Amino acid sequence: MTITKRKNTFYTSQFISYMKGYYLHPDIRGNLVAFTSDDDVWLMTLEDMKPIRVTSGQGVAIRPKISPDGKKIAYTIIWLRKGKGGGDIFITGNGETKRITFFGSMNTRVLGWLSDDEILVLTDFHTPFPQWSETYKININDGTMEKIPFGPISNIAISGDIIVIARGYQDLPFWKGYKGGTKGEFLISYDKGNT
């Protein structure tokens, strides 16, 4: 069997003709795809593959997540002003942008949506060290926060009753043979984290 490398395997030629650049942090919900490029959030449908810029000039946008109803996008904006950096969560939908957090922490990002009104956020806000991040559930309507007792995590995936937590997975890719205590691991719960 011969394996040949093809340029741009994951994109249709139609998509490439519209945009050339660096594409990061994709998220998909139904037929919608959100991603970042040129420090902004972009959105497109799988039918027409024509990206539309959703944000502009707010700072560096990262990790967009589309709401379950497909009407909102949560994302992190990172900025650097007068030698100090920060990051917070914003929601864009129905032509409006709303700032959800006021943490000012570079290590703040959206993990995903729990419902159309609640997001999961990972942040080092209220922790003694920037490497120590905790998970919060935030209501996007009234801003109420609830700390979720998952302990230290790097990422999370939720589907129905199943929760997969990733810990320590940012290790450098060339550490493949590393067998020490900080290698990444997945923890899986089949009952919404009750066990």
Swiss-Prot record:
GO terms for cellular component: cytoplasm. It is found in: Cytoplasm. GO terms for biological process: proteolysis. Its EC number is 3.4.21.-. One of its GO terms (molecular function) is serine-type peptidase activity. Keywords: Cytoplasm, Hydrolase, Protease, Serine protease. Gene3D superfamilies: Tricorn protease N-terminal domain (2.120.10.60). InterPro entries: Tricorn_protease. Its main location: cytoplasm. Degrades oligopeptides in a sequential manner. This is Putative Tricorn-like protease N-terminal subunit. It comes from Sulfurisphaera tokodaii (strain DSM 16993 / JCM 10545 / NBRC 100140 / 7). The lineage of its organism: Archaea, Thermoproteota, Thermoprotei, Sulfolobales, Sulfolobaceae.
